[in-house]
Amino acid sequence: MEPAAGFLSPRPFPRAAAPSSPPAGPGPPASASPRSEPGVLAGPQTPDASRLITDPRSGRTYIKGRLLGKGGFARCYEATDTETSIAYAVKVIPQSRVAKPHQREKIINEIELHRDLQHRHIVRFSHHFEDADNIYIFLELCSRKSLAHIWKARHTLLEPEVRYYLRQILSGLKYLHQRGILHRDLKLGNFFITDNMELKVGDFGLAARLEPPEQRKKTICGTPNYVAPEVLLRQGHGPEADVWSLGCVMYTLLCGSPPFETADLKETYRCIKQVHYTLPASLSLPARQLLAAILRASPRDRPSIEQILRHDFFTKGYTPDRLPVSSCVTVPDLTPPNPARSLFAKVTKSLFGRRKSKNKNHSEEQDNVSCLVSGLMRTSIGHPDVRPEAPAASALAPVSLVETAAEDSSPRGTLASSGDGFEEGLTVTTVVESALCALRNCVAFMPPAEQNPAPLAQPEPLVWVSKWVDYSNKFGFGYQLSSRRVAVLFNDGTHMALSANRKTVHYNPTSTKHFSFSVGSVPRALQPQLGILRYFASYMEQHLMKGGDLPSVEEVEVPAPPLLLQWVKTDQALLMLFSDGTVQVNFYGDHTKLILSGWEPLLVTFVARNRSACTYLASHLRQLGCSPDLRQRLRYALRLLRDRSPA
């Protein structure tokens, strides 16, 4: 589409009369989606006049849609050309905000710098015009908003995700610097995400031409948390300042907050000038090394864009070709396509657990239950009076939780575990990485303390494992939830549960396939599993006591209880991973328990030796610290999760 107007005039031109009727053509009605195809419209419609934007020179009309964002000078809306149905992001700047010459000059500068940029990772400039009320800048629409929105939903990202986004930022930034343009406001909110998850650098409101050092402007500009020390010291803004901002972006995505962020702006600026920040030990060594290289006080000491791309963080770490859309709100399952990793996974499964049968009779595409289960392994439970051995946990001697040296920090001696469990839906890797990111962010920044902060007065009801039995040498792992639902994760990876009232059986051959039966109508092929499930339920009811004094949860409040995806036993604790992201760690020696749940926000529930339970916001623990008892268990849980991570 050709620009509808030339350059901005030095002064607003007279108000143009709005057309008496919308232009001919299939313009979408006010209630239509801005991206509606012309062919599906019933014919010319008359949109609400207040939503129309008309180019005074060409007469072309646009329908203003949803608000995409707003800043100090402008608001950004989705806008659709009524003739072509092409959707744009339009930046609307009131004339009243650019009444002074220097204000108007900034807008002219932004347009002049942006209009000729053509790069895959730069937001595309389309055209602009103005009327008596506003200036309109039409840009490429990035439908998934910005990296700031993803960060707010996720708080921290995985290192492969950070590499994925940084590579695109670096590509766009390299293009800008080669054309002699400094962005000067690199931050999460200025990295926009398209429908197919590509990143585009945008918002050139503070951009400037690169000048020789002696001619650079000394003004302080940018966003406080991302401003380089030389800018604060009024030494001018060069390419190295953009690199500094990029380092702050990388740190924020990996650690959950900007490196120099404080509650006071003066203190933030002091930390920036002194380069005073903390590198969490939970980050990988290449990530820490790259951040330390970028965030250096002297611009001359910082790496160039080419040097950053050659760093081990990028060359030796996995970068996905594309991120799933779901990663905007939840941790993605990122498994590198590595033959060695696949071989290792097969060996691990052969040692620690059997996967469910994949013979053709067990096809997940068949909807008929009898066909679905016809190929299941038939398991005989023997004589009904045969009792399973006592739970393995009860036979273990108390163990110490004294921390070991860093080089021996991974939990050793896994006694037993399940396999990968379900192969579809929310995976073990997803749960592990999500918990790992959240927990390491909490532990890494936690200050020393002698006692726990105040717990939540009325936490939401929590579904947790109150009893468990490990009989995986024959059948599987049985457990009872606090809602009184009893379930078994069988050795073949299937899952069966009995409702709290013992009237309904829930069967999951995979995490995305679910069948419910009344107890009296369970198919014959599933009767062996039901017999085992009932026996587990009876054993736990008669021989085991509830593992803590958390409030009971009525099953009606939990219509879809979490499924156990995987369990792992070490010499000190039992780790359980659930399909809703809940992580529970039971410590054998003193019967304490740690439960991570919620995620938005993350909740940490600690069941102490005396069976009393308290729930804390992870953000409070991060800010205020916690007792040595809880800290040790959080660190052990972190090591357990790290040991399960494929990274």
From Swiss-Prot:
List of residues binding ATP: 68-76, 91
Annotated InterPro entries: Kinase-like_dom_sf, PLK3_STKc, POLO_box_1, POLO_box_2, POLO_box_dom, POLO_box_dom_sf, Prot_kinase_dom, Protein_kinase_ATP_BS
GO molecular function, one term: protein kinase activity
Entry text on domains: The POLO box domains act as phosphopeptide-binding module that recognizes and binds serine-[phosphothreonine/phosphoserine]-(proline/X) motifs. PLK3 recognizes and binds docking proteins that are already phosphorylated on these motifs, and then phosphorylates them. The POLO box domains mediate localization to the centrosome.
Maturation and modification: Phosphorylated in an ATM-dependent manner following DNA damage. Phosphorylated as cells enter mitosis and dephosphorylated as cells exit mitosis.
Catalytic activity: L-seryl-[protein] + ATP = O-phospho-L-seryl-[protein] + ADP + H(+); L-threonyl-[protein] + ATP = O-phospho-L-threonyl-[protein] + ADP + H(+)
Domain (Protein kinase) ranges: 62-314
Location (main, coarse): other
Function: Serine/threonine-protein kinase involved in cell cycle regulation, response to stress and Golgi disassembly. Polo-like kinases act by binding and phosphorylating proteins that are already phosphorylated on a specific motif recognized by the POLO box domains. Phosphorylates ATF2, BCL2L1, CDC25A, CDC25C, CHEK2, HIF1A, JUN, p53/TP53, p73/TP73, PTEN, TOP2A and VRK1. Involved in cell cycle regulation: required for entry into S phase and cytokinesis. Phosphorylates BCL2L1, leading to regulate the G2 checkpoint and progression to cytokinesis during mitosis.
Residue span(s) of domain POLO box: 464-542, 563-646
Tissue: Constitutively expressed in post-mitotic neurons.
Subcellular location: Cell projection, Dendrite; Cytoplasm; Nucleus; Nucleus, Nucleolus
Species of the source: Rattus norvegicus (Rat)
Region (Disordered): 1-56
Protein name, as recorded: Serine/threonine-protein kinase PLK3
One GO location term (cellular component): centrosome
EC number: 2.7.11.21
Factors inducing expression: By the intense activity associated with seizures.
Active-site residues, record numbering mapped to chain: 185
Family the entry assigns: Belongs to the protein kinase superfamily. Ser/Thr protein kinase family. CDC5/Polo subfamily.
Quaternary state and interactors: Interacts with GOLGB1. Interacts (via the POLO-box domain) with CIB1; leading to inhibit PLK3 kinase activity.
GO term, biological process aspect, one: mitotic G1/S transition checkpoint signaling
SMART domains to which the protein is assigned, alphabetical: S_TKc (SM00220)
Superkingdom of origin organism: Eukaryota
Key words of the record: Apoptosis, ATP-binding, Cell cycle, Cell projection, Cytoplasm, Cytoskeleton, DNA damage, Golgi apparatus, Kinase, Nucleotide-binding, Nucleus, Phosphoprotein, Repeat, Serine/threonine-protein kinase, Transferase
UniProt biased composition (Pro residues): 20-31
